[in-house]
């Protein structure tokens, strides 16, 4: 159970799974992690997200906004990520490197979604340099907010600025005002509400491809 997992040490965890009709048992080799990495993943995964250890595939995303949106978009497409053994795991507080190492040691498949800014490319390079290019998706925009603005949800940001006139304001300024007025999680919920009104056709193709890949990896893990 999740309660049991959160109460025992990382190195005491054993994950049993089938791969190509062979049953395997995996555990964590703490020698492959620094003390700081062990501390971070113990808190981030074992204590805060123990149920993620039961997943067959992790999708690493930057933060809370992506968690809200991707779960909702998947649901709109008739996909229950949890039922499919897929878990969204935010990496902003922990970093990508230790989470990828953890997934590999436990035999959990994974995908990475990063922003298109400098930090996002840094995370992506780390994964690609380890030979995982096919697992990495970089947003074609500097962050999730700009991506959504440019892919069907511009009106949501414009509406949530609270301004009667947006004349002379560019995309960056409109997003900045909307986020300042509503916060990032608040805007995520506004996007979700709009998406529910429009229907599944509004789900960006990039996200649809990530879901499809995650299901393939989950079902072959």
What residue spans do the PLM features occupy?
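Hydrophobic transmembrane alpha-helix bundles
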Residues: 1-8, 34-39, 120-129, 153-158, ...
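Conserved GHKL (Bergerat-fold) ATPase module
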Residues: 2, 185, 197-198
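RecA-like P-loop NTPase motor core
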Residues: 3-119, 133
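Generic structural signal for hydrophobic core residues of well-folded globular domains
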Residues: 8, 73, 148-152, 156, ...
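Exposed alpha-helical structural elements
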Residues: 36-40, 98, 143, 155, ...
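Activity-critical C-terminal alpha-helical subdomain
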Residues: 115, 122-193
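Terminal low-complexity/disordered tails
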Residues: 189-221
């Amino acid at each position: 159970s999740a309660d049991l997992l959160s109460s025992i040490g990382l190195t005491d965890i054993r994950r049993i799974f089938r791969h190509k009709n062979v049953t395997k048992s995996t555990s964590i080799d703490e020698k492959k992690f620094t003390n700081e990495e062990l501390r971070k993943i113990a808190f981030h995964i074992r204590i805060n997200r123990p149920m993620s250890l039961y997943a067959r595939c992790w999708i690493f995303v930057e933060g809370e906004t992506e968690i809200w949106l991707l779960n909702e978009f998947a649901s709109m497409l008739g996909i229950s990520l949890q039922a499919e053994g897929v878990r969204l795991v935010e990496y902003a507080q922990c970093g990508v490197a230790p989470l990828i190492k953890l997934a590999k040691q436990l035999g959990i498949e994974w995908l990475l979604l990063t922003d298109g800014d400098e930090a996002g490319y840094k995370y992506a390079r780390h994964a690609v340099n380890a030979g995982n290019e096919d697992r990495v998706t970089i947003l074609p925009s500097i962050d999730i907010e700009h991506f959504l603005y440019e892919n069907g949800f511009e009106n949501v940001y414009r509406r949530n600025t609270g301004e009667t006139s947006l004349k002379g304001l560019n995309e960056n300024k409109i997003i900045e005002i909307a986020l300042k007025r509503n916060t990032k999680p608040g805007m995520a919920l506004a996007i979700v509400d709009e998406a529910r009104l429009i229907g599944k056709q509004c789900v960006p193709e990039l996200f649809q491809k990530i879901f499809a890949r995650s299901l393939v990896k989950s079902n072959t893990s």
